[in-house]
Amino acid sequence: MSSQETYEFQAEITQLMSLIINTVYSNKEIFLRELISNASDALDKIRYQSLSDPKVLESDPELFIRLTPKPEEKVLEIRDSGIGMTKAELINNLGTIAKSGTKAFMEALSAGADVSMIGQFGVGFYSLFLVADRVQVISKHNDDEQYIWESNAGGSFTVTLDEVNERIGRGTILRLFLKEDQLEYLEEKRIKEVVKRHSEFVAYPIQLLVTKEVEKEVPVEEEEKKEETEDDKKPKLEEVDEEEEDKEKSKTKKVKENVKELEELNKTKPLWTRNPSEVTQEEYNAFYKSISNDWEDPLAVKHFSVEGQLEFRAILFIPKRAPFDLFESKKKKNNIKLYVRRVFITDEAEELIPEWLSFVKGVVDSEDLPLNLSREMLQQNKIMKVIKKNIVKKLIEAFNEIAEDSEQFEKFYSAFAKNIKLGIHEDSQNRASLAKLLRYNSTKSVDEQTSLADYVTRMPEHQKNVYFITGESIKAVEKSPFLDALKAKNFEVLFLVDPIDEYAFQQLKEFEGKQLVDITKDFELEESEEEKKQREEEIKEFEPLTAALKEVLGDQVEKVVVSYKLIDAPAAIRTGQFGWSANMERIMKAQALRDSTMSSYMASKKIFEISPKSAIIKELKKRVEDNGAQDRTVKDLTSLLYETALLTSGFTLEEPASFATRINRLISLGLNIDEEESTETAAETATEAPVEEVAPETAMEEVD
């Protein structure tokens, strides 16, 4: 025998196998689903290769998956005539290179997740250790010799040139040496049960080697022949053809014997070719699990066909939960399997479905696409674009159907709200349809989310726009000073607290003819003639104060204005219409690779709004009139007011230390502590404050 080569498992794989082999998980049958799924993938690869090079199938023209139980050896064999693995692939794929999902699956498992999720993480092969404590993988690739990969789930595995087993032409045999308490998986009945439950809709024949009792005609025994000879000596009646026939028959007899033969377990025709009215929900659920590696039933299914100039059939499934790597950009999405006239082509047709719908799983079978589709043809093919357009349309229909059941829609929205918002941002054609699916908490719906359509029905007659506020969380926005004036007018405000919300609304711009207005930016609020008149008077009255505040704050603000949109709060900071909001500025600052030039360009000039109704503002106005803008107390109070407004308006402070110094001075004042008693450090920090030079007297001594 050829010399063995021993390799160490990658550390994460060793941990994974240890977790699996020692699990107390009861539903261990899923190992067969995972291994059949891997076999099906290997067959997909060789069939796809054969479309451009038919010679690759010469090593074994038949495409199949074969299950062979060997009770006497306590071994279950799973064979496929797929693409097979080279020596290097056996080493890398099964042992030394951990897949991205290895660690993620272990973390999920430690957190109490179901072992049956293993396929979603791309490490389904190792599920065999649920039932086996040793495995041999015998594999033959067209470009290499036949090799044996072997492991007992320890820290290492061996690879050997195969000189002992039968030649398999092409493909892979998994030889599982079952644990003593898992021998049920050698029973014909149990195997059939598991295949029917999990793998009935695999596209290739799954054959099971079964033992059947058959009747067979065999020659009669010698004694019987002798008796026959004696009978021949007796006088006979005239023979006829029938008697001759009987005579022939009498020379054989029927006996029962056991024979082994292959039985196909998945004869059901492809589900998508059947009429939707003939397919049961159980069949849809089973089919979904077979193509998705999910252990749960789908939330919804859309089964349809398109006929006319273009023909295709599709079954699309919406899962109950988002996969762990939904927004992992480097991972290839392989959720939609593309067939052409029942022949599998690829599960990497990214052109078939937009990225924002990448959570949808299913099958598309086209009658019109060519069988020899290349990557370039997929990207440029007009038929693909039409199929994609139809798929998106049907899925939006499905989402609206889910929305009719509030409980189901809540599950859907909690899992895939980000996808809907991404769709609004990216898909201009379907933006208006998707907007109907959006749900938000609001000033009138704090505990339950509301739709934009319901918002519009609640709008007072004189309200012209749909108002929203952006922020980090509901708690951060529900006490915002920006809400006061709108609440006073009975105008509802939507709370947008998901970072993607603002991107979506920037593209959406309007809903049912009503403008979407961000109240953290400068905007025109509906007002009566009386309110307009009062505002004009207040602007005139507070003009000296706004000029003084602008003088103190300088370039920190674009302008200081008297606000008619504030009630309780003394001041707030709004941004211009076309720059970033405070929330967007926060999001962009968190981007590690942000463009600093773009940041300085888009960071909008700030508008400092003061409320003429506020007692603080009225007192500050009086101080300015008495002492002028350069008064120490006026300057200090202005800076404190501005920095506080920055915080309540959702901004971050550029110089928190200066702000802290001013607050500490206020605390000292409240506690009747003289400035001389303050620490030297505090005094030094105060000198660094940007708004003034340090005066010899207590900065806030005049404040009551």
UniProtKB/Swiss-Prot annotation:
GO terms for cellular component: cytosol; perinuclear region of cytoplasm; plasma membrane; protein-containing complex. Molecular chaperone that promotes the maturation, structural maintenance and proper regulation of specific target proteins involved for instance in cell cycle control and signal transduction. Undergoes a functional cycle that is linked to its ATPase activity. This cycle probably induces conformational changes in the client proteins, thereby causing their activation. Interacts dynamically with various co-chaperones that modulate its substrate recognition, ATPase cycle and chaperone function. Belongs to the heat shock protein 90 family. One of its GO terms (molecular function) is ATP hydrolysis activity. Residues 690-704 have a biased composition (Acidic residues). The gene is HSP82. InterPro entries: HATPase_C_sf, Heat_shock_protein_90_CS, HSP90_C, Hsp90_fam, Hsp90_N, Ribosomal_Su5_D2-typ_SF. It comes from Eremothecium gossypii (strain ATCC 10895 / CBS 109.51 / FGSC 9923 / NRRL Y-1056) (Yeast). This is Heat shock protein HSP82. A motif (TPR repeat-binding) lies at residues 700-704. Homodimer. The keyword Coiled coil does not apply. It comes from the Eukaryota. One of its GO terms (biological process) is cellular response to heat. ATP binds at residues 38, 80, 99, 125, 375.
